[in-house]
Amino acid sequence: MSVSRRVIHHGLYFAVLGPLIGVLFLVLYIFFAKEPLVLWVIIHPIFLLLSITTGAIPALLTGVMVACLPEKIGSQKRYRCLAGGIGGVVITEIYCAVIVHIKGMASSELFENILSGDSLVVRIIPALLAGVVMSRIITRLPGLDISCPETDSLS
């Protein structure tokens, strides 16, 4: 498979599925945390939409990063997952820092609350989980034909 096709494949799959994995964790965290954020989710259903749109660009960039990993790292599941998780966290933090400094994009109070330093766990853990899970399953998704047997097995 050509590098450009792998970059497009990884980037799009990460951008579409990655934020959904993060939102799943976020909903579970809010449900079990018994914090006032539960009221925000009930009152503002746009919370999930903001979470997905906030995570789509970092997920796309993480997918491109995972696609561009050298063959030695990309062909081993552990290293690919480690790189995907760390890359997801770093790219998400850089992206959120840029958005907070632009202030024009962070106009709503809820959006600023999500991106503030007080809710670090709301950004880091979903990005880490999405990066690791997507790096793990990316070779099993349709459209990618890798002949490396170690990469194709889920064990």
From Swiss-Prot:
Report the induction information.
Answer: Induced by the two-component regulatory system CreC/CreB.
Where found?
Cell inner membrane
Q: Which family does it belong to?
A: Belongs to the CbrB family.
* Transmembrane spans: 12-32, 37-57, 82-102, 114-134
**What protein is this chain from?**
Inner membrane protein CbrB
Topology of this chain in the membrane: Multi-pass membrane protein
Q: What else is known?
A: Disruption of this gene leads to hypersensibility to nitrofurazone.
| Topology Cytoplasmic: residue spans | 1-11, 58-81, 135-155
- GO CC terms: plasma membrane
Q: Which gene encodes it?
A: cbrB
Topological domains on the Periplasmic side lie at: 33-36, 103-113
Domain of life, per UniProt, equals: Bacteria
Species of provenance: Escherichia coli (strain K12)
For this UniProt record, give its keywords in alphabetical order, as a comma-separated list: Cell inner membrane, Cell membrane, Membrane, Transmembrane, Transmembrane helix
